[in-house]
Amino acid sequence: MNTEIIVLFIIHFIMINENVFIALLHYPAMDKDGKIIVTSFTTMDLHDIARPARAYEINKYYIVQPIDAQRIVIQRQINYWLSEEGRKANPTRYEIVQLVRLAYTLDEVIEDIEKERGRRPLLVGTDARTYPNTVKYSWLRNEIQKRDRDWLIVFGTGHGIPPDLMNTFDYILEPIYGAGDWNHLSVRNAVAIILDRLFSRNRCD
């Protein structure tokens, strides 16, 4: 058994929150006028979301990007960091990128999770607005800790996830409230904050 296979084996079986997955949607997304668009991938989307995903021991992190030219860029980066050269250059990045998967659509993500886990995950949307099915962090944390269901937490890009898609989710997580009214955070900020609120060992309840 080679070293890479051993590392993958260890990471898979020590993940505390193996029933939790996250997805970053580059499509569908909205522009400032509410028009449906495809947003562009940035390198920070890969590294700065994979890091908290690993720190809070999430099962997998999916990047949803349907544009082939963008997918080539993403896959090239993934392949490099999973190569022997990438592992030697940055072992930590080699480890976190093992959590990353690339998908064309959100449906593909759901199907992949179903194939691995044998059941459909409950979908949790994230937004700066509230919806009739908005839930609190404490509620979601308690439900996740029961370990009897799988959860897919979906993060938007651009100006957010379109309402038509949000309305199909099982739950919507309450917005991130800071010290005041300003909450225009990057998606990378939002992912880190939300995962910390749900899974940190030293969170303030």
UniProtKB/Swiss-Prot annotation:
InterPro entries given in the database record: Alpha/beta_knot_MTases, RNA_MeTrfase_C_dom, tRNA_m1G_MTases_N
Keyword Ribosomal protein: no
Keywords assigned: Membrane, Transmembrane, Transmembrane helix
Domain of life: Bacteria
Transmembrane residue ranges: 5-27
Keyword Transmembrane helix: yes
Membrane topology type: Single-pass membrane protein
Subcellular location: Membrane
Gene Ontology CC, one term: membrane
CDD domains tied to this protein: TM1570-like (cd18085)
Similarity comment text for this entry: To T.maritima TM1570.
Name this polypeptide is given: Uncharacterized protein aq_054
Source organism phylogeny: Bacteria, Pseudomonadati, Aquificota, Aquificia, Aquificales
